[in-house]
Amino acid sequence: QAHGMGQLIDLVPNHMGVLGADNAWWNDVLEKGQASAYAEYFDIDWHSATPGLAGKVLLPVLGAPYGEVLARGELSVEYEARSNRWFARYFEHRLPLAPASIFGPLRDAAAGGKPEVLAQALDGINGPAGHDALHALLDAQSWRLAHWRCAADEINYRRFFHVNQLPALRTQREEVFRATHA
């Protein structure tokens, strides 16, 4: 107040919150991987030596190891007709799926415009008999789901301390700096 200020705000412009499905840049990276216009905005190690992480972003959001979560049926696929987009769902996490990864029966069911056919196709992949197909679909993404405890050892992006939902931005790059300060 001695300096005529009513409020002082401490900004952290080199990190960005990505929790939830509201961050368009992060979701674009998840959907398109290295082909995303924003892939270089985040400080992601796309060439990780960790098995299964080359070309992928680690998403340590699971409450248990991946195999257990899959076996318990806690992962599912959703289709959003109004945007013609596909998502993987894990409780509150809604993760975009790469359009090219959507295989024949699901793609055809959505294109057919018959809700009952689409519901049947989704029941097939989301049910116990669809675990192999669901795993193959998830494995084809530019991200890899993992138990949250894996983050300390396997995370392949710089973040704010150990907060997985605050990945670092490469604000040292002029285009990123401008985009984050617009």
Predicted regions and their residues:
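Catalytic cores of glycan-processing enzymes that make or break glycosidic bonds
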Residues: 1-182
